[in-house]
Amino acid sequence: MANVVVVGAQWGDEGKGKIVDWLSERADVIARFQGGHNAGHTLVIGNQVFKLSLLPSGIVRKGKMAVIGNGVVLDPWSLFAEIDKLSAQGVEISPANLMIAENTPLILPLHQDLDKLREEAAGASKIGTTGRGIGPAYEDKVGRRTIRVADLGDEETLDSRLDRLLAHHDALRQGLGAAPIDRAELRAKLLEIAPKLLQYAQPVWKVMNDYRKAGKRILFEGAQGSLLDIDFGTYPYVTSSTTMSGMAASGTGLGPSAIGFVLGIVKAYTTRVGEGPFPTELDDADGQRLGERGHEFGTVTGRKRRCGWFDAVLVRQTCAISGVDGIALTKLDVLDGFQTLKICTGYEVDGQHYDHLPTAASLQAKAKPVYEEMEGWQESTQGARSWADLPANAIKYVRRIEELIQCPVALLSTSPERDDTILVTDPFAD
């Protein structure tokens, strides 16, 4: 059986949580490999709704091992709050079903402070971060001054790390008009949580390789979306990690050959949270309708999402970069009742045609979508579980998307319920 990597192929919020949950029933191990608690998943299982932002989606299923890899930045206090919330909903979480890489960097309160201070100082030029310290935590990782999970096990090491970290942050805070960090208070907080966090710590790279050798089925769960990738996203309006499929290997300690099937999650229209270019954005009644019908509010921030028509150019681009083998098309039911649907097939920039999104921010800002119109459908697709349940025009819409993005549909989702899914290609099959 192939291991499967799940990545968002747009700006996030594509419905990865449901798809990962649907796939996790057949996986043995579900691993997060990048990001932090800045992206949320909403899972609907029976009559229960679970909202996750850091824990892998598979944590809600019994008999699965949930893994937080070294590519993640971990806020321990948010982790414990999420564990407590799920425990109150009847989910059992212990070292028997949750493992955290020893070399995972920690998000500390000072990272969140810096995130907010910078956004306030930027004013109208702000990036639109969630303010949860993700970016500053990754900066410290690359700057070789981060505190990692394993550092909590030795006070001498922790003190050395704190000295280096605070020398940097106090200088930044002074420039932003903020008071120095209370070292004693931060140290006490870290020592307080150390035993609780260290119980989950493991050499994830070794355990994952052992799982692979034993033939365990591994599901790699990406966060955010490919268009928020630090290298290939709409820079600088991006996240601070690599969101493409290749990160599944380096973010857990498995080699690239461990990746079998890459599944890109794609919404049947387009949404975005925060600032940045969005060529197909709709500021009219159609955009309002998409937002209302799709319940487009962020799981983590509660912010209203910007909505627009499906952008085949962007999805083709991200599928190529991540090596997507098949997509899971979600929220098709949101398009029920539209008389006419539009798909972006290219851009016009200063009279020149583009079949991809240009890298230069100045060109991205001027990109005008070139649309292809398709006839909509009035019948309901909600809850469809086979092609026979879909209106003819809905099938035409799906097939046209496949042609334009040059990638087949492997799964089709027609409601938040996990079983309302049409399987075309089994991602776990060799």
Swiss-Prot record:
It catalyses: IMP + L-aspartate + GTP = N(6)-(1,2-dicarboxyethyl)-AMP + GDP + phosphate + 2 H(+). It is an enzyme of class 6 (ligase). Pfam families: Adenylsucc_synt. Its cofactor is Mg(2+). GO terms for molecular function: adenylosuccinate synthase activity; GTP binding; magnesium ion binding. Substrate binds at T299, V300, T301, G302, R303, K304, R305. Its EC number is 6.3.4.4. One of its GO terms (cellular component) is cytoplasm. Plays an important role in the de novo pathway of purine nucleotide biosynthesis. Catalyzes the first committed step in the biosynthesis of AMP from IMP. PANTHER family: ADENYLOSUCCINATE SYNTHETASE (PTHR11846:SF0). This is Adenylosuccinate synthetase. It comes from Paracoccus denitrificans (strain Pd 1222).
